[in-house]
Amino acid sequence: MALKDLVQDVHTKAENQPFAKLLMSGDINPTQYATYLFNQEEAYRALEAQADKHGILNDIPEIRRADKIKEDFKACRFMRVMRPEKDHVRVLPSVRRYYNYVNEGLTEKQCWAHIYVRHFGDMYGGNMISKRIKFMKHQMYAFDRKKELIEHVRSKLSDDMV
């Protein structure tokens, strides 16, 4: 059975979470989206730092998302959708738990599994999200060499990663 099929139940559960539905609806407001971006950057920075410890992104640097997410977050602030003195963005508890978990150390195999879920989720789902959220451009969902990235990451996956 393919890894995609093995994680389908978890994927379906994630898609049915209230925030995921809000994100996909296009009804998310800019402040909510900025909070989302801020938290995504935290998660991606942690994961990409662990991946760097294993050197696994050296051949595919364009898969990195943290800096692109940061640029999107800055764009939200530039649009004045957030007022720094009033709109304090915070790391959500679930993201803090993920950050702590990742920073405890991931094996190379675990890094690939997390990259598959996070980066591919944004690669595929991001196309739909960016069409629905029209108040800004979305750097985080723009992947160069998409076909090559997909092939490279898939070559590192195995069914025992579930």
Question: Which residue ranges define each predicted feature?
Answer:
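Metal- and O2-centered redox machinery and metal/ROS homeostasis
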Residues: 1-162
